[in-house]
Amino acid sequence: MWATCCNWFCLDGQPEEVPPPQGARMQAYSNPGYSSFPSPTGLEPSCKSCGAHFANTARKQTCLDCKKNFCMTCSSQVGNGPRLCLLCQRFRATAFQREELMKMKVKDLRDYLSLHDISTEMCREKEELVLLVLGQQPVISQEDRTRASTLSPDFPEQQAFLTQPHSSMVPPTSPNLPSSSAQATSVPPAQVQENQQANGHVSQDQEEPVYLESVARVPAEDETQSIDSEDSFVPGRRASLSDLTDLEDIEGLTVRQLKEILARNFVNYKGCCEKWELMERVTRLYKDQKGLQHLVSGAEDQNGGAVPSGLEENLCKICMDSPIDCVLLECGHMVTCTKCGKRMNECPICRQYVIRAVHVFRS
């Protein structure tokens, strides 16, 4: 280890060999990803909808549309058509029309796209989901369209399922009316008149469908009328100040009707926690409205129908009939009544955009 050529102690140039420790042995290279445990077996096939495992391959059915596996309960076959899952059947029943797809739930749209492996992560609107469905719609033959529209009566369960999204749009027929009367209501008036002329007389059974058809059209015509023109309380419409004939009528109003009257006349009811507080504001509004109307009508009677120039300044500059009782914001001009103020998009004086119209009470 030490050089003996001179009296100097010099290190030898060869490194000292360190004997391997006992118990250590050379280990061959091994793959770190290798595991001595047996590889896991493949997942058992299960239904995509309910998650039930298939006991045998006979219960496994493949949807022709989304190509996913379903059980016998979650898939069906309408007539001689292809076997589809229940969700794909609902979409095929719409014939992939935009109007029908917009009526479906967002969850159903997302589930359908998920079955077709289409990501909906960036979709924020329902219309975007409908566009994705329309972009990947399968090819539907004319036979499938007719089968979806007119189903075979031999499959009532499938017919009830496919027509379920549209059941809310069909008005229920009265059980007292016979089936012939229900069919006669769809007959056009021109055809009814031709049948009357051909038969020479009209029976009572033939007159009833025409009468029912005319009565059914009355609510649609009434809905188009203005709310302000109605003078009596009608269920399903908002209450109005013109419905009140006396102060005693205010006591019979509900809390919702009181709030509707205040909201229609631009009176703020925030902070009112009790019903009597709402009644107090409606009473004040009613008295103020009646007082202004009596003031204008009394001045017209004294002057023979003409409004004096002093009171003309207090009349609405739009209708020239009701007194000025609201202020337009943000400009602050008082030139209209409440009825005309809520229809103003811009101030008639300064042409500034109207953000809000607020009812004011005169002292």
From Swiss-Prot:
- InterPro entries, per database record: CARP1_2_FYVE, CARP2_FYVE, RING-FYVE_E3_ubiquitin-ligase, RNF34L-like_HeH, SAP_dom_sf, Znf_FYVE_PHD, Znf_RING, Znf_RING/FYVE/PHD
EC numbers on record:
2.3.2.27
- Membrane-related topology note: Peripheral membrane protein
Subunit organization: Interacts with CASP8 and CASP10. Interacts with RIPK1 (via protein kinase domain); involved in RIPK1 ubiquitination. Interacts with PRR5L. Interacts (via RING-type zinc finger) with p53/TP53; involved in p53/TP53 ubiquitination. Interacts (via RING-type zinc finger) with MDM2; the interaction stabilizes MDM2.
Q: Which pathway does this polypeptide act in?
A: Protein modification; protein ubiquitination
Q: Which GO terms describe its biological process?
A: apoptotic process; intracellular protein transport; negative regulation of extrinsic apoptotic signaling pathway via death domain receptors; negative regulation of signal transduction by p53 class mediator; negative regulation of tumor necrosis factor-mediated signaling pathway; proteasome-mediated ubiquitin-dependent protein catabolic process; protein K48-linked ubiquitination; regulation of fibroblast migration
Which compartments does it reside in?
Cytoplasm, Cytosol; Cell membrane; Recycling endosome membrane
Q: Where is the composition biased (Polar residues)?
A: 165-203
Major enzyme class: transferase
Instruction: Provide the taxonomic classification.
Output: Eukaryota, Metazoa, Chordata, Craniata, Vertebrata
Question: What SMART domains would the database entry show?
Answer: RING
So which domain of life are we looking at? Eukaryota
Q: Which reaction does it catalyse?
A: S-ubiquitinyl-[E2 ubiquitin-conjugating enzyme]-L-cysteine + [acceptor protein]-L-lysine = [E2 ubiquitin-conjugating enzyme]-L-cysteine + N(6)-ubiquitinyl-[acceptor protein]-L-lysine
Where do the segments described as Disordered lie? 165-209
Domain comment quoted from the record? The RING-type zinc finger is required for the ubiquitination of target proteins.
Q: What is this protein called?
A: E3 ubiquitin-protein ligase rififylin
Q: After translation, how is this protein modified?
A: Autoubiquitinated.
Its biological purpose: E3 ubiquitin-protein ligase that regulates several biological processes through the ubiquitin-mediated proteasomal degradation of various target proteins. Mediates 'Lys-48'-linked polyubiquitination of PRR5L and its subsequent proteasomal degradation thereby indirectly regulating cell migration through the mTORC2 complex. Ubiquitinates the caspases CASP8 and CASP10, promoting their proteasomal degradation, to negatively regulate cell death downstream of death domain receptors in the extrinsic pathway of apoptosis.
By its UniProt entry, which PROSITE patterns does this protein fall under? ZF_RING_2
* Cellular component per GO, a single term: endosome membrane
What Pfam families would the database entry show? FYVE_CARP1-2, RNF34L-like_3rd, SAP_RNF34_RFFL, zf-C3HC4_3
How is this protein induced? Down-regulated upon DNA damage.
Modification sites for Phosphoserine: 226, 229, 232, 240
Please give the tissue specificity annotation from the record for this chain: Ubiquitous. Detected in spleen, thymus, prostate, testis, ovary, small intestine, colon and peripheral blood leukocytes.
Q: Which residues belong to any copy of the SAP domain?
A: 101-120, 250-264
| GO molecular function list | p53 binding; protease binding; protein kinase binding; ubiquitin protein ligase activity; ubiquitin protein ligase binding; zinc ion binding
Q: Which UniProt keywords apply?
A: Apoptosis, Cell membrane, Cytoplasm, Endosome, Lipoprotein, Membrane, Metal-binding, Palmitate, Phosphoprotein, Repeat, Transferase, Ubl conjugation, Ubl conjugation pathway, Zinc, Zinc-finger
